[in-house]
Amino acid sequence: MNSDVSSSEHELSQDGSSQNNPSENSVSSPNSNESVNQVELSDNPEVEPQVKNDSVDTANEQSSTSCESNIKGSDTEARLQQLEKEHETLNSQYMRIAADFDNFRKRQTRDQDDLKIQLTCTTLSEILPIVDNFERARQQLNPEGEEAQALHRSYQGLYKQLVEVLKNLGVAPMRVVDQAFDPSLHEAVMREPSDEKAEDIVIEELQRGYHLNGRVLRHALVKVSMGPGPKVINEEIPDQSASNQELSESVDGSTKDEN
């Protein structure tokens, strides 16, 4: 009877202690679960090969990923090089086209300028004979009466206006007398000996030449010196009276010998 009571009291005391420390029971339970799991993993022979297989698969995936990244990097670099080459090609083509267009523009401008100059030269060449006639009239005419002088002054005024217009257009007369003959500027019409001028020096201007903005508008017609002429050799002429006297003396001597 007493033994039963003591045993029941012992059980009650254990139950009370367990109820008074619920935290201890709750903390100790996870550790106990982890230890149990470790024991179960260590005891299970299939777990270790599975872990090894997972690590191998991970390594294979990493290596394949690195290979793919290397392949993508090489493709990107090749594509970049190709784009750089295409850029250089297009840039060179653009520079060539730009240079060709610039040359075309300059050539067109030069051709237009040349055409303008040709038209101007053609027009002025038709006007120059009128200027020549005015100059001849000024040199040859010598008006004496008052009316003639008034008429002379009037057309000389027209001549001055015409010369001024030509000057404004860039026309300038040549100065050729006493200059060395230049076939690019002069046209030799006559050649004659001259004791005063050296050879190939312009003696006289027969028709005035003109420049147009540095270009030859009309060549000058000139007379060119040939230099000093050949010297005349003055041979001594024997005295006719002396020869006659010698002839008479020889005749007299011959007659004396005969006698």
Curated annotation (Swiss-Prot):
Main location: cytoplasm
Region Disordered: start-end pairs: 1-74, 228-259
Disulphide bonds in the chain: none
PANTHER family (alphabetical): GRPE PROTEIN (PTHR21237), GRPE PROTEIN HOMOLOG, MITOCHONDRIAL (PTHR21237:SF23)
SUPFAM superfamilies attached to this UniProt entry: Coiled-coil domain of nucleotide exchange factor GrpE, Head domain of nucleotide exchange factor GrpE
PROSITE patterns xrefs: GRPE
Task of the protein: Participates actively in the response to hyperosmotic and heat shock by preventing the aggregation of stress-denatured proteins, in association with DnaK and GrpE. It is the nucleotide exchange factor for DnaK and may function as a thermosensor. Unfolded proteins bind initially to DnaJ; upon interaction with the DnaJ-bound protein, DnaK hydrolyzes its bound ATP, resulting in the formation of a stable complex. GrpE releases ADP from DnaK; ATP binding to DnaK triggers the release of the substrate protein, thus completing the reaction cycle.
Extent of Low complexity compositional bias: 17-40
Protein's recorded name: Protein GrpE
One cellular component term from this protein's GO annotations in UniProt: cytoplasm
Keyword Secreted set for record: no
A GO MF term: adenyl-nucleotide exchange factor activity
Domain of life, per lineage: Bacteria
The protein's assembly and partners: Homodimer.
Protein localization: Cytoplasm
